[in-house]
């Protein structure tokens, strides 16, 4: 059962980081760099996605002591990741007093069928989505923020672009049916394609966007990548491996923050992109075997 007051508070917190950058950090020193660069929040985790992908094995919730050390270091909001479906990890993270939980496909899923019932928590959640159906199902479960899944740990933005365009196309289809008075088609779309309640579909139709903020994530490595996702309609960006796997993390972090805020100013994008050193080498998504793709986890 949804707690409406709590839902409004959770969505309100998510809006507080709108137009900002959330940066993955693995220690207090990186968290300080992120805050000094202007990050809206940090994501505390033991290994960035590039290392999780390279090292393999089962990836779980990070050590609570490490999360608390990062929380003590900075004044900006702190987020942390729980495995898909692992509601006990989420309970533990909530008890730490952090600001948001990411139910993340980057970690090894704990449940192949069920996501966490996010309506049962007071803490807000962010979840990944590849299309409108996935986004609305996570919102129906209680997510206060959506992000593209992209393909984390690659430095290749193509999947994030694909997912954002898919969400936009789904919204355009809903709005088109709604404005033409095609209620039957909307009902069929809600039931068969989106698999969510009609009231959520009508909310999208009236707002002409998702009812929660929608960030970009997965493969963002440069200021231009961040600006690209913002121009596609994202409300902000998550940057994982792209900062601290680059040659000059401090300058790249500042540049990505500037590009996210000034996403529609090509001269600013060009200026902040100068002399940043080498970007993370990355992996072409096309070179990754299908069974190793992280974005396919949790639909």
Swiss-Prot record:
Active-site annotation: 81
Molecular function terms, GO-annotated: pyridoxal 5'-phosphate synthase (glutamine hydrolysing) activity
GO biological process, one term: pyridoxal phosphate biosynthetic process
Alphabetized UniProt keyword annotations: Lyase, Pyridoxal phosphate, Schiff base
Binding-site list for D-ribose 5-phosphate: 24, 153, 219, 240-241
Assembly mode: In the presence of PdxT, forms a dodecamer of heterodimers.
Name of the protein: Pyridoxal 5'-phosphate synthase subunit PdxS
Organism this protein belongs to: Methanococcus aeolicus (strain ATCC BAA-1280 / DSM 17508 / OCM 812 / Nankai-3)
């Amino acid at each position: 059962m949804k707690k409406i007051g709590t839902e409004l508070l959770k969505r309100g917190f998510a809006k507080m980081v709108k137009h900002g950058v959330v940066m993955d950090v693995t220690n207090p020193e990186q968290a300080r760099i992120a805050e000094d660069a202007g990050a809206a929040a940090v994501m505390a985790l033991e290994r960035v996605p590039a290392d999780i992908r390279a090292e393999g094995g089962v990836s779980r919730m990070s050590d609570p002591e490490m999360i608390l050390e990062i929380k003590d270091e900075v004044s900006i909001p702190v987020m942390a990741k729980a495995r898909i479906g692992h509601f006990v990890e989420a309970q533990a993270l909530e008890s730490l007093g952090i600001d948001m939980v990411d139910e993340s496909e980057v970690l090894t899923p704990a449940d192949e069928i069920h996501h966490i019932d996010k309506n049962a928590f007071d803490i807000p959640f962010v979840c990944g989505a590849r299309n409108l159906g996935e986004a609305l199902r996570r919102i129906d479960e209680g997510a206060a923020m959506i992000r593209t899944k992209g393909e984390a740990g690659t430095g290749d933005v193509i999947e994030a672009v694909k997912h954002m365009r898919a969400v936009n196309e789904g919204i355009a289809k809903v709005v088109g049916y709604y404005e033409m008075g095609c209620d039957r088609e909307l009902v069929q779309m809600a039931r068969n394609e989106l698999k969510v309640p009609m009231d959520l579909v009508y909310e999208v139709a009236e707002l002409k966007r998702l009812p929660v903020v929608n960030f970009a994530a997965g493969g963002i490595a440069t200021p231009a990548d961040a600006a690209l996702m913002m121009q596609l309609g994202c409300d902000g960006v998550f940057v994982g491996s792209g900062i601290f796997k680059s040659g000059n993390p401090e300058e790249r972090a500042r540049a990505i923050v500037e590009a996210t805020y000034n996403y529609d100013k090509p001269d600013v994008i060009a200026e902040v992109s100068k002399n940043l050193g080498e970007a993370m080498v990355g992996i072409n998504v096309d070179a990754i075997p299908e069974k190793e793709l992280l974005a396919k986890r949790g639909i």
